Amino acid sequence: MSRVSQARNLGKYFLLIDNMLVVLGFFVVFPLISIRFVDQMGWAAVMVGIALGLRQFIQQGLGIFGGAIADRFGAKPMIVTGMLMRAAGFATMGIAHEPWLLWFSCFLSGLGGTLFDPPRSALVVKLIRPEQRDRFFSLLMMQDSAGAVIGALLGSWLLQYDFRLVCATGAILFILCALFNAWLLPAWKLSTVRTPVREGMRRVMSDKRFVTYVLTLAGYYMLAVQVMLMLPIMVNDIAGSPAAVKWMYAIEACLSLTLLYPIARWSEKRFRLEHRLMAGLLVMSLSMLPIGMVGNLQQLFTLICAFYIGSVIAEPARETLSASLADARARGSYMGFSRLGLAIGGAIGYIGGGWLFDMGKALAQPELPWMMLGIIGFITFLALGWQFSHKRTPRRMLEPGA
């Protein structure tokens, strides 16, 4: 086995272990934020939505800067610093008793993510061969789902005692992850050339096809982020207990572990990436529409099931398509900018979703936020269809089996 092949194989295992620690650290804390501050402390959902939206916007909106800096100086220092910063954000969240302190803790957490997320994504593109990326992204998603359940279970159990224990556990996991990267991650360059920060950003901004694709995905993310805000609140409201939230993530884990990899393997040889992305988005949009009209957990979990199936179809295709469109001379910058759609869509989804949820309750129209999200999903579906039909991505990147 050549040294390059050996490095790729070792890199895969490193990426999987690193990803599991990050997912556990994140899901121990974030699914419980809305329950802690809305249900237990009585804050308005929009206050928590602002905090979650701020974290999302800071982490993803500034990702191009984190990616460009990583292109210049390498992945390791950015990843280690970012993970320590997120740990500090979680520690601060544990003592948050006013909205401004929660917002500040989410700002720190988001800034940490800005530093570590783009270089971690770029490492996947660097280490995984193009023909293997779709399946590897599917493996990461399966791991994300399992980690989400374990993290949510652990966080729900700790929440019975003290929210500070929840935040401390998340902080410790990110400190461990920082030490893991500091110890084992080689000082790899992310791009084929050591691109200056401005040059990497300029290269991305001049790629109109990529920019249009990323911005169009904002609507997709408005739906996707509700697994962290409105869906946990809805489950808690109907069940009457925050313990029921863990079953929502258990559904995701079961579907991902049983369906994600087989669907990716089967569809990669039969359907183009953009068709898989659009099909998943359509299923997600249809499942959102009736959620506000359900009256029991069985109906709600059935719709959540459909939503997750749509995500299982769409997510590997979206990740693979974003990676395929990245210029090898500025991988960090491209993967950083690819998060801008999540920044915009996530911020609007959290803040707008929280506001619509409060408004729906005030007007006695609980279906209002869900109907709006479904409509946004359909508009995004049409926008993606127009983009793919008028601005064709090179066939070698999109065709089945590519």
Curated annotation (Swiss-Prot):
TM regions (residue ranges): 13-33, 99-116, 139-159, 165-185, 214-234, 244-264, 277-297, 300-320, 340-360, 368-388
Alphabetized GO MF terms: transmembrane transporter activity
Sorted UniProt keywords: Cell inner membrane, Cell membrane, Membrane, Transmembrane, Transmembrane helix, Transport
Periplasmic side: 34-98, 160-164, 235-243, 298-299, 361-367
Record carries keyword Phosphoprotein: no
Pfam family, one: MFS_1
Protein name: Multidrug resistance protein MdtH
Gene coding for it: mdtH
